[in-house]
């Protein structure tokens, strides 16, 4: 981007942890990056504080009832930032000339429409919303290709693969990719010990600072399962060419093995600002605020196979990928409902994979031809899982 104009960046999900990391990187490079659009779900006060700090042209609150609070708050701050509310406003801005780059960091299936809108408009899409790929990966990648949109993954694992693959003309020379997993806070525990896990314990991740939903997904290994499905869509690889290794130090973010016997790995400290800096500046490199990796002080790098008996969510994700069609959408939706119930104390930790498996075995698989089909599968999976929860409550 040397000598070019400012990159106009929309940060969707600005009040979350990924949004904060993105804004940190953007603020370090005022000569090349500008936060032009900021969005939040319902945290209007947090959004106003971010607007005061970054002075975007547009601010969006997803909860339309909070529009007056956002509008009046911006006026009170003396900001020229234009207030918007609702999902339609978000989608419109994603596709408008208000931005050329979108950081898609809205959690859950709610982030899909704006992600698709950005892809349709040919934007550079920094994808942190894994549900977009899991729910509608085929549709999203097809849309992006047709419109010339560039998808750069922000997950540390997929960013690592992206960087390794872009280091050469890989073509058909990839034998397999290996995603690494920290193993979560309960690595090494058996199912009996996992039965007693509390929500507070599950959200305390040993390596990464994350929101509650993704922290639980990391603890169940569903996060890694979703990443396997993502990798399939991002890099065009079948499930048989995607492996997972548990790596407790979280320093090797992923590896790519080539047909000539070479293996490339990307290493770095566990900080999302690195991958966001990659996405914001690619193919250039810019300062992210993250220090270098001192391997001597780290001491050792350990690797082990994931325990899919204790953590069946990873196996369920592979099953859904093999089934194809709407199965990944069902997996994702059932998991969202199950994790929410666990965080609210309605069910135990082991109920999460049980509820997901129930939805996968109950609902028929359909071809994932349209967004409507996928959203219908998503809604069905939520209903089936909610009914299973109600049944659980009656018999608890």
Swiss-Prot record:
Pathway: Isoprenoid biosynthesis; isopentenyl diphosphate biosynthesis via DXP pathway; isopentenyl diphosphate from 1-deoxy-D-xylulose 5-phosphate: step 1/6. Its cofactor is Mg(2+); Mn(2+). NADPH binds at residues 15-18, 41, 129, 131, 211. It catalyses: 2-C-methyl-D-erythritol 4-phosphate + NADP(+) = 1-deoxy-D-xylulose 5-phosphate + NADPH + H(+). The keyword Repeat does not apply. Mn(2+) binds at residues 155, 157, 227. It is an enzyme of class 1 (oxidoreductase). Keywords: Isoprene biosynthesis, Manganese, Metal-binding, NADP, Oxidoreductase. One of its GO terms (biological process) is isopentenyl diphosphate biosynthetic process, methylerythritol 4-phosphate pathway involved in terpenoid biosynthetic process. Its EC number is 1.1.1.267. One of its GO terms (molecular function) is manganese ion binding. 1-deoxy-D-xylulose 5-phosphate binds at residues 130, 156-157, 182, 205, 218, 223-224, 227. Belongs to the DXR family. NCBIfam families: Dxr, PRK12464.1. Catalyzes the NADPH-dependent rearrangement and reduction of 1-deoxy-D-xylulose-5-phosphate (DXP) to 2-C-methyl-D-erythritol 4-phosphate (MEP). HAMAP family: DXP_reductoisom (MF_00183). This is 1-deoxy-D-xylulose 5-phosphate reductoisomerase. It comes from Xanthomonas oryzae pv. oryzae (strain PXO99A).
């Amino acid at each position: 981007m040397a000598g070019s104009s400012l990159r106009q960046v929309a940060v969707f999900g600005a009040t979350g942890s990924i949004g904060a990391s993105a804004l940190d990187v953007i603020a370090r490079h005022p000569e090349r990056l500008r936060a032009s659009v900021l969005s939040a779900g319902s945290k209007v006060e947090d959004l106003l504080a971010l607007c005061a700090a970054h002075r975007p042209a547009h601010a969006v609150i997803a909860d339309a009832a909070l529009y007056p609070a956002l509008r009046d708050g911006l006026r009170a701050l003396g900001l020229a930032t234009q207030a918007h509310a609702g999902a339609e406003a978000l989608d419109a801005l994603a596709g408008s000339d208000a931005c050329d780059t979108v950081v898609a960091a809205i959690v859950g299936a709610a982030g899909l429409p704006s992600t698709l809108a950005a892809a349709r408009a040919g934007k550079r899409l920094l994808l942190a919303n894994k549900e977009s790929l899991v729910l509608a990966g085929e549709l999203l990648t097809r849309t992006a290709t047709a419109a010339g949109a560039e998808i750069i993954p922000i997950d540390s694992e997929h960013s690592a693969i992206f960087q390794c693959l872009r280091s050469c003309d890989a073509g058909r020379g990839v034998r397999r990719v290996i995603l690494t997993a920290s193993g979560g806070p309960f690595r090494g525990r058996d199912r009996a010990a996992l039965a007693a896990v509390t929500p507070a314990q599950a959200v305390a991740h040993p390596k990464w600072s994350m929101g509650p939903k993704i922290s639980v997904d990391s603890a169940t290994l569903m996060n890694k399962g979703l990443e396997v499905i993502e990798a399939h869509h991002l890099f065009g690889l079948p499930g048989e060419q995607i492996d997972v290794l548990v790596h407790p130090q979280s320093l090797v973010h992923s590896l790519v093995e080539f047909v000539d016997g070479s293996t490339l790995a990307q290493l770095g400290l566990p900080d999302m600002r690195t991958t966001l800096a990659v996405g914001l500046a690619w193919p250039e490199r810019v300062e992210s605020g993250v220090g270098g990796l001192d391997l001597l002080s780290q001491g050792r790098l350990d690797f082990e196979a994931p325990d899919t008996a204790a953590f069946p969510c990873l196996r369920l994700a592979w099953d859904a990928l093999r089934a194809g069609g709407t199965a990944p959408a069902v997996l994702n939706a059932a998991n969202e409902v199950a994790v929410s119930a666990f965080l609210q104390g309605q069910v135990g930790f082991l109920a999460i994979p049980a509820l997901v498996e129930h939805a996968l075995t109950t609902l028929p698989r359909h071809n994932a031809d349209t967004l409507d089909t996928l959203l219908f599968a998503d809604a069905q999976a939520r209903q089936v899982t909610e009914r299973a929860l109600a049944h659980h409550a009656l018999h608890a």
